[in-house]
Regions:
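Bacterial Sec-dependent N-terminal signal peptides
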Residues: 1-24, 268-275
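Non-catalytic macromolecular-recognition regions in eukaryotic signaling proteins
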Residues: 20-267
């Protein structure tokens, strides 16, 4: 595998600390849908659906380059039901979602893959890092739920900040990424021969250097298995895999979500908001 194309990668959920450039993988519970949201024109959205945001947290100077799958290292995002995709203005990547449409129905809950962006000209940040200025006001009383499971309501701090989103470049996932197209049709994104990446790499919009790499909405049991590549400040790369490392690859158990304890029970990595 050429690391320049799909940099092997490293993704970890929660707040696992490492000696390398990757500090954490953070899973943010962004929003929990209610009855009003379910009745929007954006497509079928079951009550109680959870919108998750996944961030790669890196040391200063490091860049997110790619999430990848190759033989022996499956890249997988899955739910036991279906992923929600907004049928009105949704997209497989957020770069194609106009800022002006974010206020419409449930566009803000669309499922997509990212390299830092959250819309056409906005970047994604943790709600807890949002200053609450220029918060999006949703039309017709949508997205007003204050479920404590999701922490800060998005009507107060929406997790968007102005910026130039890095463009997502995909390799070999044209069929797989269709699960995030503008209709709810599937429950699994999987590839063993492809990646989503950003040429030149991307850094986070805050000093913490967290890059948003995906947003997924589902009412099912959400899980993933990730492999990630990040670029070092000196121009090198660090590659992290969920299983079976070879060569210079680094295996990190937290790339599998939810994690499994030694006794076989499952343990959710630390999420935002804290439990």
């Amino acid at each position: 595998m050429k690391s320049i194309l799909f940099s092997s990668c490293f993704i970890i959920f929660g707040y696992h600390v490492f000696a390398q450039g990757l500090e954490n993988i953070i899973v943010e519970k962004y929003y929990v849908s209610n009855k009003t949201d379910a009745n929007s024109i954006g497509g079928y959205l079951p009550i109680g659906s959870v919108t998750y945001r996944i961030y790669v947290d890196m040391l200063p100077g490091y860049k997110f380059q790619a999430a990848f799958g190759i033989p022996g290292h499956e890249l997988r995002l899955a739910t036991t039901t279906l992923f929600y995709n907004n049928e009105d203005k949704g997209g497989t990547i957020p770069n194609v979602i106009p800022d002006a449409c974010l206020k419409d129905n449930t566009v803000m809950l669309d499922s997509w893959l990212s390299a830092g962006g959250a819309s056409e000209s906005k970047l994604g940040i943790l709600k807890s890092d949002d200053d609450g200025i220029n918060t999006i006001v949703s039309a017709k009383n949508y997205l007003q739920n204050e479920d404590t499971e999701a922490g800060i309501p998005i009507k107060v701090q929406d997790g968007f900040v102005a910026g130039i989103p890095p463009r997502v470049t995909s390799f070999g996932i044209d069929s797989a990424i269709a699960v995030f197209n503008n209709q709810t049709i599937g429950s699994v994104f999987s590839t063993s021969n492809g990646s989503w990446a950003t040429l030149g790499g991307s850094i986070g919009p805050t000093a913490d250097n967290m890059v948003l790499i995906a947003q997924l909405t589902t009412n099912g049991y959400f899980s993933f298995e990730l492999n990630i590549q990040i670029g070092t400040s000196g121009g090198g790369v660090e590659q992290y895999v969920a299983k079976n490392p070879v060569g210079n690859e680094i295996q990190v158990a937290g790339l599998i979500y939810p994690m499994t304890n030694g006794d076989g029970s499952t343990k959710l990595n630390k999420e935002v908001p804290d439990k």
